[in-house]
């Protein structure tokens, strides 16, 4: 997990993965 702070919510985690997947 890079580019993200140590503390984040599961929603941010999912949103980040979805965004990365869509913009891969």
Curated annotation (Swiss-Prot):
Q: Which UniProt key words apply to this protein?
A: Leader peptide
For this entry, list what GO says about its biological process. Answer: translational attenuation
Going by the entry's taxonomy, the superkingdom of the source organism is recorded as Eukaryota
For this chain, the annotated S-S bridges are: none
Question: What's the stated role of this polypeptide?
Answer: Arginine attenuator peptide (AAP) that has a regulatory role in the production of arginine-specific carbamoyl phosphate synthetase. Encoded by an upstream open reading frame (uORF) within the 5'-leader region of arginine-specific carbamoyl phosphate synthetase small chain (arg-2) mRNA, it attenuates the translation of the downstream arg-2 ORF. In the presence of high concentrations of arginine, ribosomes translating the uORF encoding AAP stall at the termination codon, resulting in reduced translation from the downstream arg-2 initiation codon.
Q: Which family does it belong to?
A: Belongs to the arginine attenuator peptide family.
What is the protein's name according to its record?
A: Arginine attenuator peptide
Supply the source organism for this entry: Neurospora crassa (strain ATCC 24698 / 74-OR23-1A / CBS 708.71 / DSM 1257 / FGSC 987)
Task: Cite the source lineage.
Answer: Eukaryota, Fungi, Dikarya, Ascomycota, Pezizomycotina
């Amino acid at each position: 997990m890079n580019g993200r702070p140590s503390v984040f919510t599961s929603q941010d985690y999912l949103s980040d993965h979805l965004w990365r997947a869509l913009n891969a």
